């Protein structure tokens, strides 16, 4: 009787981990392209770490030299301009993928895997923190004033706020000490993100992926490789194609022109605003006339994602077969787009009023509308079960 050779990827202590994650992983056969964004986020993180390391080799974290060192990277370092453009626009692609990933999670009820969802929300918050401290590093006008305005919000905390701000700044204003520590945070956080990503994947593999039907995935599963590995590679090609097109043809389209001006503490820009992917949260912050209230609203705008698993009242997992919930979901997306636009507008009438309405709608959808609709749709399904036919007049 001949001895069957063992496959090393299945028996090796280290390779077997990769095998169970990327090769022999049982995956639902019917997952759509919306399930691609997790792997795209991994690609974005790897790309950001590689380009970031190359940039860090030439960057100088000093208020006198930071701006010049970024110019030096673009002008004198071989392909430095490309690394800088890929890193800056890679952040935008990162957040596009994050928002698509979160949107898919809300639509298809992925948040019911509570551990995976909670780690994901922490990942989102850490990514936002990483992007914020990174935006300060070029030491342009918007870098300096963005850092000043956003960090100064912490002073709204009762009793300890002012002390925390001075401690964070390393002085009584945003200075060289602030830039040095922000560079340190920006360097270390992506590696923490990578570790958290492994925890995120570990929790996901405890339950397995959900699927577009919202039913038990164990009925029909196939191995990850070659089916979904090739599907992911197609996503990689599309993402990299878009990223390179932006980086080569319109590298500054998503940036802020004021950041090409050296930071000047004596001259405030006409409109202080963050990068486009934070504008919705910035709009919510500005919608509250009270400083502390604005900070609470800003934190709540992201942390509200943590309550979704507990406000889920529907008998169905996702929104695939729930017309009312679908309409509300797309109203939420439109509301976020409106908040993003409003965040870039001046803080004056009518924009402030529009922002307050849009912010109220945002919170109401999560806290009230989704739970109430879940309850109503349960009642409608019960009625249709008793009568033998679905009463569409109750839906539309």
Swiss-Prot record:
Molecular-function GO terms, alphabetical: metal ion binding; ubiquinol-cytochrome-c reductase activity
Positions that bind a ubiquinone: 205
Keyword Heme attributed: yes
Family: Belongs to the cytochrome b family.
PROSITE patterns: CYTB_CTER, CYTB_NTER
Cofactor(s) the protein requires to work: heme b
A GO cellular-component term linked to this record: mitochondrial inner membrane
Subcellular location: Mitochondrion inner membrane
Residues at which heme b b562 binds: 87, 186
CDD domains reported in the protein's UniProt record: cytochrome_b_C (cd00290), Cytochrome_b_N (cd00284)
Record: residues binding heme b b566: 101, 200
Ranges that cross the membrane: 37-57, 81-102, 117-137, 182-202, 230-250, 292-312, 324-344, 351-371
Coiled-coil features, chain-numbered ranges: none
Function field: Component of the ubiquinol-cytochrome c reductase complex (complex III or cytochrome b-c1 complex) that is part of the mitochondrial respiratory chain. The b-c1 complex mediates electron transfer from ubiquinol to cytochrome c. Contributes to the generation of a proton gradient across the mitochondrial membrane that is then used for ATP synthesis.
InterPro entries assigned to the protein according to its UniProt record, in alphabetical order: Cyt_b/b6_C (IPR005798), Cyt_b/b6_C_sf (IPR036150), Cyt_b/b6_N (IPR005797), Cytb/b6-like_sf (IPR027387), Cytochrome_b (IPR030689), Cytochrome_b_C_euk/bac (IPR048260), Cytochrome_b_N_euk/bac (IPR048259), Di-haem_cyt_TM (IPR016174)
Any further remark recorded for this protein: Heme 1 (or BL or b562) is low-potential and absorbs at about 562 nm, and heme 2 (or BH or b566) is high-potential and absorbs at about 566 nm.
Keyword Transmembrane attached: yes
A Gene Ontology BP annotation from the UniProt entry: mitochondrial electron transport, ubiquinol to cytochrome c
Subunit structure: The cytochrome bc1 complex contains 3 respiratory subunits (MT-CYB, CYC1 and UQCRFS1), 2 core proteins (UQCRC1 and UQCRC2) and probably 6 low-molecular weight proteins.
PANTHER family, per database record: CYTOCHROME B
Designated name of the protein: Cytochrome b
Highest taxon of source: Eukaryota
Annotated cofactor note: Binds 2 heme b groups non-covalently.
Keywords: Electron transport, Heme, Iron, Membrane, Metal-binding, Mitochondrion, Mitochondrion inner membrane, Respiratory chain, Transmembrane, Transmembrane helix, Transport, Ubiquinone
